[in-house]
Design a protein with these regions (language model features):
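Phosphate-binding loop of NTP-binding sites
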Residues: 4-140
Length: 140
């Protein structure tokens, strides 16, 4: 029952955020993780979970992978808004899950910020990981 409430809270928070003119792609995940920090461990994920990370090229690579997968008849859930932090991934997963906790897709495709990747991996283990590049893109 608690999982149901947490998932519903995420969905409603994101809808309310969008209604008030915000993107609504992160806040629901933040609320859900405050209610249950392990909620992502309780979601039934699809057979394929793909993470894409790197210093640059994440969004383009994710979009390209999405197009390839959908053209091959896979139902894909991915963070097209680019919300690639732990709360953004939580929103993505929970917003696309049934209230029973099953993700509604064949593939979960996640664009991951390289700094937040380790936090996501505490809760979601990808079956595949693509690293676009490793370069210093910020001053030390």
């Amino acid at each position: 029952m608690w999982k149901f409430i947490v998932i519903l809270s995420c969905k409603l928070t994101n809808k309310l955020s969008k209604l008030t003119g915000h993107a609504g792609s992160v806040i629901g995940g933040r609320v859900a993780r405050k209610l249950d920090k392990n909620i992502l461990k309780k979601i039934k994920l699809p057979k394929y979970v793909i993470g894409i990370t790197g210093s640059s090229g994440k969004s383009s690579s994710t979009e390209l992978m999405y197009n390839i997968l959908t053209k091959n008849n896979y139902k894909v859930v991915y963070n097209k808004e680019g919300s690639n932090t732990i709360d953004g991934i939580a929103s993505l997963v929970l917003n696309n899950s049934r209230l029973t906790g099953k993700l509604k897709s064949d593939v979960l495709l996640m664009e991951l910020d390289e700094k937040f990747m380790k936090y996501v991996f505490e809760y979601i283990t990808p079956t595949h990981l693509m690293i676009t590049n490793i370069t210093r893109d910020q001053p030390p």
